[in-house]
């Protein structure tokens, strides 16, 4: 039997750039796969997380989010900025994104390896910096999003993601919801359908009248 959320999926998209070379991007990809597997295996999330790769340029950002908009199964995107300043690749084309957005402003590690930390580690693990810049640019673009507080392995953080997923699923389901209004005015007339038209543009639901107000 299909469960309520089986028809949906949430994409996981990692932001990076080629400033530190291909080896860094390979490491970013490995960390991203580790996080996605951990989130799916946690048992806390109602919707499956699907890793959609690392985006390293504005063209890749645009292509990925355009694909998300056109995929009926995708109800939202989890963004994670792994390296230094991936948000520079987010431009005006990102403003057309229709999917729900959440971001994980935390490094893949839960602690800091003080004994072994070097510049390679510092250059690679800059989520705190990258996600702050991402938050800055999407705020300037007036894009609403959920910011998850806490490490991705923490139960509290996973519960935040789960709640966001449920809201995103409800919104997606409402886009083709049929609402029947009783005792309404004339149907399919621009003037009398004004309120119904407003509701449709606001929540995406189809307002339909079956029983007229005249008795």
Give a label for each model feature.
Residues 1-215:
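Metallocofactor- and cofactor-centric catalytic cores in central/energy metabolism, strongly enriched
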